[in-house]
């Protein structure tokens, strides 16, 4: 039996509470946009300053992993949108399923990203840890036959790890949100009348996806100086 939604004492009714919660999420997302916007602005300025080094950095990216992760997140956005849809219809069974599939795809994304980080570590691309202008494949060659990376590629990789690292943290939070919503759904907190937390959680997940849609071309696809 679904539980009646609880209205906090500072609100007049459920509608006011719902609108306030939604506004709060949009306000939070606005601050997140500012945060990532600053990172993108700094990245763009540095790319204009050292175009060749940043082009070389993009060429060192695992474009197939980035592409796979893009497909994973876009699919997860579909599932979370379906979760909102069935929540409005009061179909709790499918709500739990769609939220679960969204969380699973989030874990798949993190798994692929971890694999990519591992490969980049093996290739000596991590600033402050093992970055080298000479790739492991060329270290055994005579100096005349080596093709060193630009020293400024270190800056590209720094931006790469900062931006994708912060994004990965947001994905982890998003997975936690999906799991929390599943717990609430199983306890009967949602019905066709009250499902605002699902909509708010979906807003956050869509934001995560949108950020990646900008990160992927900026870091992986812009291979022209």
Name what the model sees in each region.
Residues 1-225:
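...captures the hydrophobic TM-helix bundle architecture rather than a specific catalytic motif
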């Amino acid at each position: 039996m679904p539980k009646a939604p609880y209205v906090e004492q500072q609100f007049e009714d459920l509608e006011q509470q719902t609108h306030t919660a939604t506004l709060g999420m949009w306000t939070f997302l606005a601050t997140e946009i500012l945060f990532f916007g600053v990172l993108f602005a700094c990245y763009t300025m540095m790319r204009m300053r050292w175009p060749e080094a940043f082009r070389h950095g993009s060429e060192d990216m695992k474009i197939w992993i980035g592409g796979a992760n893009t497909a994973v997140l876009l699919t997860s956005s579909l599932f979370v949108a379906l979760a909102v849809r069935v929540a409005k219809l009061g179909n709790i069974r499918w709500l739990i399923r769609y939220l679960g599939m969204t969380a699973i795809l989030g874990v798949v994304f993190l798994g692929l990203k971890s694999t990519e980080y591992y490969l980049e570590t093996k290739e000596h691309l991590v600033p402050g840890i093992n970055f080298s202008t000479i790739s492991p494949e060329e270290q055994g060659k005579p100096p005349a036959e080596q093709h060193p990376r630009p020293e400024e590629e270190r800056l590209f990789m720094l931006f790469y790890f900062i931006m994708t690292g912060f994004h990965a943290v947001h994905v982890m939070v998003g997975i936690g949100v999906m799991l929390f919503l599943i717990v609430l759904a199983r306890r009967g907190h949602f019905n066709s009348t009250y499902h605002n937390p699902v909509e708010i959680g979906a807003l956050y997940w869509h934001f995560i996806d949108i950020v990646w849609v900008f990160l992927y071309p900026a870091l992986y696809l812009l291979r022209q100086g």
